[in-house]
Amino acid sequence: MPEPPRDIMAEACEATRPSEDEDEEREPLLPRVAWAQPRRGAPGSAVRLQADQGAAVLREPATEEPPVVSEDRSISASLSTELDRTRNAVSETNTFLEDPEFADVVLKAEQAIEIGVFPERISQGSSGSYFVKDSKRTIIGVFKPKSEEPYGQLNPKWTKYVHKVCCPCCFGRGCLLPNQGYLSEAGAYLVDTKLQLGIVPKTKVVWLVSETFNYSAIDRAKSRGKKYALEKVPKVGRKFHRIGLPPKIGSFQLFVKDYKEAEYWLRRFEAEPLPENIRKQFQSQFERLVILDYIIRNTDRGNDNWLVKYDEMKYAKKIESEESNWIDDKQLLIRIAAIDNGLAFPFKHPDEWRAYPFHWAWLPQAKVPFSEETRNLILPFISDMNFVQDLCEDLYELFKTDKGFDRAAFESQMSVMRGQILNLTQALRDGKSPMQLAQMPCVIVECSKSGGQGRVVHLGSSFTQTVHCRKPFFSSW
């Protein structure tokens, strides 16, 4: 029998001591006493219950065979048990008690990974993002790990590596905090929910582990070594805190079906103009996209990363049944999905090389003033500074979960967002268009140190408004 490698044995002897240089990607481990116990009613218990039942058969006396378990079967059962414990620890962090539907989707993703249906890397984009599937191989979500973001160390796309090596002076976006894209994705959904826009697919922060994710060679070697030690020397292998690859934290966004890139539909609409009612619906959805992007100051909004769903067949059937060119305004036949929100929430306005403009500002829809429907929906929210403060506090609760969270940097992010909200409020009151909104001077609204500590906030006494005059080298306006 081959001997285990010396480095694996050395790691096993020190497994009881906590590591001082754990990768920030790794899941915060639970105490062994806590995660060694079977969970009750937690996501993933159904699948792991079946695995436990399969292992229990080995311990029960059979009618045709003696109740003696072979060494190989004992090792296999031990390995399966340790892997289940690791999976339980991962699933413990993916509990969404306030949203059972989302928890069920994440559970399906975990179950699929356990049976070998792994997430599939998306070829498009500049980061490592993955289509997550259920056990039937149906796409149910998009997972974007923190470590594989455009400027992350484990980004599998070579384009950003070439960018970093060949043009380091222009590498990255100087106005954004590095490796915070997964929080930006979840934060965009939070803003969308608070403002009742309804254009961002549900997005939350989750932990997932899969062989198809991009791991370092060291992590993969450790995983193989621990499995080898557990298989050959079970007593030693059981001392490891985790068996298998380390979980990755990232944003999980529900997959939207029957949507196409906006670029496709915009060309179609130029050649085949929409009916008046459908045009109004599209304009309303477009204005919501503008409001979202402007508030979070999205630095990466092109016509290829927002989606449109237009149910032409349903509209045709409606026309045939009513023999009219008029349909119910309340029935939305065209919708917009705002995806790819990972490069938002800057801590300052872009003022270095590029301006990162909103590409929707050059569309014909951007020249139309904001509708009364949009003004009535948004103004009651953003004109109330108590609502704005609540929004900042909700974002704080989300962003502070990151290990590299910095309170001062977060306050700078909120100062930019408050300035954007202030401009948007003025534009809606003045009846401006999205294009005119994008041309307004950049404003920063900083929280005054002498402001009150209560929940009721007054703009004049608690905040200081500053106009940001510095423009980037390549300016859009």
UniProtKB/Swiss-Prot annotation:
Region (G-loop): 122-128
Region (Important for substrate binding), start-end ranges: 149-151
Region described as Catalytic loop: 297-305
Region (Disordered): 1-80
Reaction(s) catalysed by this chain's protein: a 1,2-diacyl-sn-glycero-3-phospho-(1D-myo-inositol) + ATP = a 1,2-diacyl-sn-glycero-3-phospho-(1D-myo-inositol 4-phosphate) + ADP + H(+)
Subcellular location: Cytoplasm, Cytosol; Golgi apparatus membrane; Endoplasmic reticulum membrane; Cell membrane
A biological process term (GO) from this entry: phosphatidylinositol phosphate biosynthetic process
Membrane is among the record's keywords: yes
Record keywords, A-Z: ATP-binding, Cell membrane, Cytoplasm, Endoplasmic reticulum, Endosome, Golgi apparatus, Kinase, Lipid metabolism, Membrane, Nucleotide-binding, Phosphoprotein, Transferase
Ligand binding (ATP): 129, 144, 253-256, 267-268, 340
Region annotation Activation loop: where it falls in the sequence: 338-358
Residue ranges, annotated region (Important for interaction with membranes): 157-170, 260-268, 353-362
Residue ranges constituting the PI3K/PI4K catalytic domain according to the UniProt record: 116-447
Residues where Phosphoserine is found: 45
Enzyme Commission code(s) on record: 2.7.1.67
This protein's record includes keyword Flavoprotein: no
Family: Belongs to the PI3/PI4-kinase family. Type II PI4K subfamily.
Protein name: Phosphatidylinositol 4-kinase type 2-beta
Protein's organism: Rattus norvegicus
